[in-house]
């Protein structure tokens, strides 16, 4: 609802996130998000660079009518909680990949755009990542890996399987890859 109404503010989004989060409080949210969610006051963003901003951003990429709009909506979506530059960057990189895929860009174009605009190293393979990957819930250690799984995939199922097979925060990686 928030993404489709141009008159909605960051406060509306924060209230919307809290409404849904409180309706479903036992979903394995990150600790900082859960504290924000359950606080009595609608508190300020908490400077997070966790991957929650990237996990929830897919509607922004799907709804956007331009790449600039996808980036703008992703930034707005991230900033209400994950206002650290890496949290915003992670959300924007995923929304950009989704928008570019939705509009018919090749995987080579998507890879080049993400590398050039977000500085992610997408030259590794899933096999290389899998050998050394550990649990990490930051955008900078989750988003590139999810994007690589998408780039290596052949269809939706293989994307999800590749993402989850990396290990680490695999449910979040699966959610991110699934949006792409």
Mark where each language-model region is:
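Structured, active/binding-site neighborhoods that engage oxygen-rich ligands
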Residues: 1-180
